[in-house]
Amino acid sequence: MSVYENAQNFWEHFSSRQPEIEQALTSRDYPGLVRALEPVQESAMNLTGCGFFVEDAADQFEMTFDPGPNKTSQYLARYFTDLCPAEILKKWIVNPVLMPLSQKAVEAQVQIRDHVYTLMDFHVFYTVDQKAQTFQTRVYCPGYSLIDNKEKKKEMSMYLLELAIGQTLYEAYIGSVDFVNEPPKEAVDFCGLVDFYEAIMTVVERDH
């Protein structure tokens, strides 16, 4: 089948499950939501190489593909989004990539030992490479000192940073991501992770 036919088939599959998905979201029936989404998620993975997540936004339902760094999946997710039927778009917002501070980000929690942290507990220290137009970042969480595995802390920092600012800005402006167990002593710019999107946009708009 062509990519166009695959996209049509996917949205037909989604439409067949749409009432069940919407009911589960509205009633916050998460086990029911998982059951309703499972075959559609499998279809998305087979056809685009990525999954998606759904949310009950303020006045509309929202669906977001999560293609990660894979360029083919990014292309297919955007193509599928562009072909979403108008009937679905009457009730749904459909995003081809992870958006800044989505509901998923707002609700994200990280458990470290006996402590639970949200994005509000994370800070990012950063410098701007003016020549490359990128940000060199270090993410701090009070619980990082309790984790011995450096790779795990770096992966967590990368994931949460992308969750906070969205995939588009992450790929366009983040030059490096690292972690710190304690706030750095040298003078660098910093902000809460939930405020980093605005900080990036302020710098980008100022320099353009």
Indicate residue ranges for each PLM-predicted region.
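Short linear interaction motifs
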Residues: 44-48, 59, 115-120
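Well-ordered, non-membrane alpha-helical segments in soluble/globular domains
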Residues: 30-40, 74-77, 153-162
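Short glycine-rich, basic-tinged beta-strand/loop micro-motifs
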Residues: 12-23, 58-67, 133-146
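Surface-exposed, low-hydrophobicity interaction/linker segments
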Residues: 11-51
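Glycine-rich, aromatic-bearing surface loops/beta-hairpins
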Residues: 141-208
